[in-house]
Amino acid sequence: MNALQCKIISDGGENKIMSKDEYLITDAPLKALTVFAMPMILGSFFQQVYNMADSIIVGQFVGSSALAAVGACAALTNVFICVALGAGVGAGVLVSRYFGARDYSKMKTIVSTSLITFLILSILLGLFGFCFSHPMMSLLQTPADILDEAVLYLRVYFVGFPFLFMYNILSTMFTSIGESKIPLGLLIFSSVLNIFMDLWMVAGLGLGVFGAALATLIAQGISAVFSILIFFSRMRRYKSHFSWFDGQELRSMLRIAVPSVLQQSTVSIGMMIVQAVVNPFGTQALAGYSATMRVENVFSLIFISIGNAVSPYVSQNLGAKKNERIKKGYHAALVLDLCFAVLAFIVIETLHTQISSLFLGKDGTALAYQVSGDYMRWLGYFFIFMGIKMATDGVLRGLGIMWPFLIANMVNLAIRLSVALICAPRFGIAFVWLGVPAGWLANFLISYAALRKLWPIDKVDSI
């Protein structure tokens, strides 16, 4: 954001800050969401560049087996990332709501409480992941020829997991107060750093999979440290007394965070199960699948970013008691989703082979390219389903209505898993992805039914 311009207003002895960051509750909904979401979308792109750098550089300079080893870790690492994202939702919804209500004392209390809680949680999860990397990868039926490299990559990843966890929490905090440009700047910096270090360690020093993991760890660590310093600097501008830790605020946060963590992590566990379905098809099929999983993540994160932008928009307007703006914001998000769904279709239809070659290189076989291309083109037709699902889920999260959101996502997962587990072993690997659009559509219908019951938004408390 631009430098914060504010004035202090006395209201019953409490300092209130009128800030340019309040555009989410003042500007036209489509303009506000576009301005807010675009840095998040760009940030998602750079997040995937950050993630894909390992895969592309390893695939080009080491080979498809090393690419498969890195790709085999993706489903498992996503589980742990999604725990961080889900945890951030609980804190972010409350931070947005208190920010919209200009209750900066409670806002800073929930920030402090959540950071202390999640720092401890991230260290424990990192230790768990490091100690059990080999059993977890074996459980996923990782091919024997890439198992050792996959475990090595995973262990280095978990050493740096607290940095990744805290960075994701702080990114949510930034967006909750309308600061979406700062996470973008940090992501661009860390992405560029990660690419250069990947090239140096993998291509230059010949460290292979270990070098790729180490480069990511260092970039994550630096990004997390800068995030902490900048965020604390921003918080000092909101003058108010607060508690470092508050049990009641922790319980309020967990009521929102737990369903979100369950949703995020359960879906990722489901993707691990899908990974286990893919693994028996062999290393080349896994390489093709892993390549398109990365591409799916790029486009998915566009729609996820729009949904994530909707949540603080809704929560801030709810806190400011401007409920009439919520439905308009939802419709604006659907317009953005349609535009990006059309763009995704055009890009995939025209460039799917070239995109696959970025990952598979000259070492990729015909099978790897076929799996990657078929999977990619199928999803290109149906990304609009994901878009409208994410926008609807974003409204529910912003309102703090978590259980219908959780149920809808579980149905989505159940459809995807059922088709993959039952049909893929019998009829071929294509059934791993054929059920995905049906899951997205079912998710949207359930979430929308829950949302319709709340129109107009007058059945949810402001705080």
Predicted ranges, named:
Residues F45, V49-L67, M137-A144, W200-L207, ...:
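Helix-terminus/linker motif at the lipid-water interface of multi-pass membrane proteins
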Residues L67-L127, L164-P183, G288-H352, M386-G400, ...:
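Small-residue-rich hydrophobic transmembrane alpha-helices
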Residues M40, S44, I56, V93, ...:
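Transmembrane alpha-helix boundary and packing residues in multipass membrane permease domains
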Residues I25-F61, A75-G90, L94, L119-G126, ...:
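N-terminal transmembrane alpha-helices
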Residues V79-C82, N194-D198, S223-I228, V298-L301, ...:
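Hydrophobic transmembrane alpha-helices of multi-pass small-molecule transporters
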Residues M1-A37, V95-G160, G204-V258, V314-Y381, ...:
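Short alpha-helical transmembrane segments in multi-pass integral membrane proteins
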Residues G88, Y157-T175, P183-S191, A212-V225, ...:
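Short runs within selected transmembrane alpha-helices of multi-pass transporters and secretion channels
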Residues V35-D54, V156, S190, A219-S223, ...:
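Transmembrane helical elements of multi-pass membrane transporters/channels
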